[in-house]
From Swiss-Prot:
Residues 2-25, 78-85 are virion surface. Keywords: Glycoprotein, Host Golgi apparatus, Host membrane, Host-virus interaction, Membrane, Transmembrane, Transmembrane helix, Viral envelope protein, Viral immunoevasion, Viral matrix protein, Virion. Pfam families: CoV_M. The chain crosses the membrane at residues 26-46, 57-77, 86-106. It comes from Murine coronavirus (strain A59) (MHV-A59). Homomultimer. Interacts with envelope E protein in the budding compartment of the host cell, which is located between endoplasmic reticulum and the Golgi complex. Forms a complex with HE and S proteins. Interacts with nucleocapsid N protein. This interaction probably participates in RNA packaging into the virus. It is a multi-pass membrane protein. GO terms for molecular function: structural constituent of virion. This is Membrane protein. GO terms for cellular component: host cell Golgi apparatus; host cell Golgi membrane; membrane; viral envelope; virion membrane. O-linked glycans consist of Gal-GalNAc disaccharides which are modified with up to 2 sialic acid residues (done in recombinantly expressed E1 glycoprotein in SAC(-) cells infected with recombinant vaccinia vector). The gene is M. Residues 47-56, 107-228 are intravirion. Belongs to the betacoronaviruses M protein family.
Length: 228
């Protein structure tokens, strides 16, 4: 009996003319998509528009799973062994970083109880207790001082509007910034009134420890800390 061997299927490769033709057909759509993403990433700040910032977070959140899918696709349809090796490495790195993101986000969520813990941009969450309600917002940098401003009843923390109906007397003695591995406590060091309904307070970092925010707080009390 004679055995027949099947010839390997040829690997299709794009030509330069096909690549140019693809860009000509999809150039306008790709340009609009990239322009939209660029505008969102450039102007997506909590101090400007919370809606645009949330859209920015969604785009950033989708980047890693999209990268993992593309890396796996490259592994399945690798052009040669060199491309296959790099694709496997990139896939492993992407999956490991994606898992680390979820682990850190869950740890931060346990510490704060806020869904902002899954913010892909930063692991710093600023927490301020106003009349028993804890406001949590992400901040990009690890600041040595934090500024709370009240303008005619409107509360701003680091330039981000948190709520209305507050006065300078409602500002707590302490503000916290939660991180994955620890929690920073900021003590109020300065308070100044501009007029009867406006003013600001400066908080200075005073303590760092392994704490979490309590789930229940009495109205008007300063934020307490629970060790974990």
């Amino acid at each position: 009996m004679s055995s027949t061997t099947q010839a390997p299927e040829p690997v299709y490769q794009w030509t330069a003319d096909e690549a140019v033709q693809f860009l000509k057909e999809w150039n306008f759509s790709l340009g609009i998509i990239l322009l939209f993403i660029t505008i969102i990433l450039q102007f997506g700040y909590t101090s400007r528009s919370m809606f645009i910032y949330v859209v920015k977070m969604i785009i950033l959140w989708l980047m890693w799973p999209l990268t993992i899918v593309l890396c796996i696709f490259n592994c399945v349809y690798a052009l040669n062994n060199v491309y296959l090796g790099f694709s496997i490495v990139f896939t492993i790195v992407s999956i490991v970083i994606w898992i680390m993101y979820f682990v850190n986000s869950i740890r931060l969520f346990i510490r704060t109880g806020s869904w902002w813990s899954f913010n892909p941009e930063t692991n710093n969450l600023m927490c301020i207790d106003m009349k028993g309600t804890v406001y949590v917002r992400p901040i990009i940098e690890d600041y040595h001082t934090l500024t709370a401003t009240i303008i005619r009843g409107h509360l701003y923390m680091q330039g981000v509007k948190l709520g209305t109906g507050f006065s300078l007397s409602d500002l707590p003695a302490y503000v916290t910034v939660a991180k994955v591995s620890h929690l920073c406590t900021y003590k109020r060091a300065f308070l100044d009134k501009v007029d009867g309904v406006s003013g600001f307070a400066v908080y200075v970092k005073s303590k760092v420890g392994n704490y979490r925010l309590p789930s229940n707080k009495p109205s008007g009390a300063d934020t307490a800390l629970l060790r974990i």
